[in-house]
Curated annotation (Swiss-Prot):
One Pfam family here: PBP
Gene (name only): CEN
Functional description taken from the UniProt entry: May form complexes with phosphorylated ligands by interfering with kinases and their effectors. Can substitute for TERMINAL FLOWER 1 (in vitro).
Primary subcellular site in the record, as a coarse category: cytoplasm
Taxonomic placement: Eukaryota, Viridiplantae, Streptophyta, Embryophyta, Tracheophyta
InterPro entries: PEBP, PEBP-like_sf, PEBP_euk, Phosphatidylethanolamine-bd_CS
CDD domains (alphabetical): PEBP_euk (cd00866)
Cellular localisation: Cytoplasm
UniProt keyword terms in alphabetical order: Cytoplasm
Disruption phenotype: Plants do not show a phenotype similar to those of TERMINAL FLOWER 1 mutants.
GO biological process: negative regulation of flower development; vegetative to reproductive phase transition of meristem
Keyword presence, Cytoplasm: yes
Tissue expression from the record: Expressed in tissues surrounding vascular bundles in hypocotyl of 2-week-old plants.
GO CC term (a single one): nucleus
Identification of the protein by name: Protein CENTRORADIALIS-like
Native organism: Arabidopsis thaliana (Mouse-ear cress)
């Protein structure tokens, strides 16, 4: 009899659609507007995620460096994501035990704007082999591939991941 996984990254199909697995070896927190922490599978509205969040790395040390990737695997819509993935943000060279403000932003934050259906927005944290090791930078955001990016930059599997769901807001909701 097959075992049903309770891992939210498997249930939410982040593992499978975006990455092959996640080591979950480092703790990462993502917080919008200083009080809206991202939890796997929770819904956040576009008005809450307009500005880049604070992303903290609770692991490694000042000699360990990490790369953060934020992506939307449900483009243009979750029922037919033929443009998978859309890249929203990349920050490299983040020292362990700090936050993304200490890293190097190579692709600026783009706020989520889902048009069709409920989209997953995925934060992935990769451990770098050394500072400055991320050299292959995507030239465009559309049809980004997290697996290829990780492979090209020798990042391996993510050491932390979290995702939230987001859908288009009605005008009444934004008030």
């Amino acid at each position: 009899m097959a075992r049903i996984s309770s891992d939210p990254l498997m249930v939410g199909r982040v593992i499978g659609d975006v990455v092959d697995n996640c080591l979950q070896a480092v703790k990462m927190t993502v917080t919008y507007n200083s009080d809206k922490q991202v939890y796997n599978g929770h819904e956040l509205f576009p008005s809450v995620v307009t500005y880049k969040p604070k992303v903290e790395v609770h692991g490694g040390d000042m000699r360990s460096f990490f790369t953060l990737v934020m992506t939307d695997p449900d483009v243009p819509g979750p029922s037919d994501p033929y443009l998978r993935e859309h890249l929203h943000w990349i920050v490299t060279d983040i020292p362990g035990t700090t936050d993304v403000s200490f890293g190097k932003e190579i692709i600026g934050y783009e706020m989520p704007r889902p048009n069709i259906g409920i989209h997953r927005f995925v934060y992935l944290l990769f451990k770098q082999t050394r500072r400055g090791s991320v050299v292959s930078v995507p030239s465009y955001r559309d049809q980004f591939n997290t697996r290829e990016f990780a492979h090209e930059n020798d990042l391996g599997l993510p050491v932390a991941a979290v995702f939230f769901n987001c859908q288009r807001e009605t005008a009444a909701r934004r008030r």
